[in-house]
Amino acid sequence: MMDMKENDQKRNDMMDMKSHDERKNLNSSQGKNEITFPKVLDPKKDNNGYKSYTLKAQKGKTEFYKGNFSNTLGYNGNLLGPTLKLKKGDKVKIKLVNNLDENTTFHWHGLEIDGKVDGGPSQVIKPGKEKTIKFEVKQEAATLWYHPHPSPNTAKQVYNGLSGLLYIEDDKKNNYPSNYGKNDLPIIIQDKTFVSKKLNYTKTKDEDGTQGDTVLVNGKVDPKLTTKEGKIRLRLLNGSNARDLNLKLSNNQSFEYIASEGGHLEKTKKLKEINLAPSARKEIVIDLSKMKEEKVNLVDNDETVILPIINKEKSTNKDTTPKVDKKIKLEGMDDNVTINGKKFDPNRIDFTQKVNRKETWEIENVKDKMSGMKHPFHIHGTQFKVLSVDGKKPSEDMRGKKDVISLEPGQKAKIEVVFKNTGTYMFHCHILEHEDNGMMGQIKVTK
């Protein structure tokens, strides 16, 4: 049996062999398969005024490559899930059914609801069981999503297909495209690795965040988008386990950045590039009528084609942030990841905060001797405001309400955090393997 010194030496050797934040090469989409869009799940109205839904987590088969079927997971289907459309003021009731052969939860990422129905790892639904949750929508229009959060199997279940979008809409009039599936388009970007053209998380898992070599959009490999629309609104979700995305258009055309994770910006921005951390959402509007070309590519890091878009019609900065109330230190890699030097313990409350109290949190990605790696930090049950990064005002695409912030090694950010509901909420690194390995804590919000 390997003794402790040998085991430590083996780990050190492995650490020396790879960079902390190494990006696995991602192959460009060849534009062979037209993407489709998740169906909208229509609610039933009950006698008490609730919009009533049923979501089933289930096993399925998906033909990513012709003639090759992979074992996948989905909500109400083989892969991914339907889109839920809600409005502020809606009373919502959702029956959650676990048809898997393992525990799962249903987490409402970005939704400001009572901690008892947030769907964190303590709210397990066992195989063959179900439960019904109720809540009232109390936040403004935003693009959110839902996914499982069972500890320690979040990464595996998301990778195998459990993800879906949740829109909060309003009746405010604006000029943004709003025809779902026509010019208002949900875009779920993921990266996966296929073994013999089949999905196999076990063989490709990486404790520092599983990155694939194949891009998928809305569950399609080699995706493309063909449209006749002059303007299109892309609701972008980085649904990857660990990969950061730096997105721009291949023709260097600017687009309108209209919404962050928490909803519409007070003032839209003209940008040429945006960053999407794992789990992040951003909404952009692209004016295709300004294109000279028939095709433009949505690309990552200037080169990797994520989604070819075919236009069919053409064939001073000072840190003036307030006093810090809470400090969060993100440290480590592999399975040696911690928050404030501690692994996740479901029986431990790390922080408390009063409901509706405005606090300033300082989030630091601690740089280690090997320089460290990027960590996307997420808080359940709230949308926060980025006050500063390294003492300076946040970049344009970090403005607006957010629920995830990605920090480079050595970076330090201050965020303004307010909880509108009571309950126990999670905060964690949204590299899913890090989350499963204990890079997670709990905050209890009280009256």
UniProtKB/Swiss-Prot annotation:
SUPFAM superfamilies: Cupredoxins. InterPro entries: Cu-oxidase-like_N, Cu-oxidase_C, Cu-oxidase_fam, Cu_oxidase_CS, Cu_oxidase_Cu_BS, Cupredoxin. Residues 1-43 are annotated as: Disordered. CDD domains: CuRO_1_CueO_FtsP (cd04232), CuRO_3_CueO_FtsP (cd13890). Pfam families: Cu-oxidase_2, Cu-oxidase_3. Cu cation 4 binds at residues 375, 429, 434, 439. This is Multicopper oxidase mco. May be involved in copper homeostasis and oxidative stress response. GO terms for molecular function: copper ion binding; oxidoreductase activity. Residues 1-25 have a biased composition (Basic and acidic residues). Its EC number is 1.-.-.-. The keyword Ligase does not apply. It comes from Staphylococcus aureus (strain MRSA252). Cu cation 2 binds at residues 109, 147, 430. Signal peptide: none annotated. The keyword Membrane does not apply. It is found in: Cytoplasm. Its main location: cytoplasm. GO terms for cellular component: cytoplasm. Keywords: Copper, Cytoplasm, Metal-binding, Oxidoreductase. Cu cation 1 binds at residues 107, 378. Its cofactor is Cu cation. Belongs to the multicopper oxidase family.
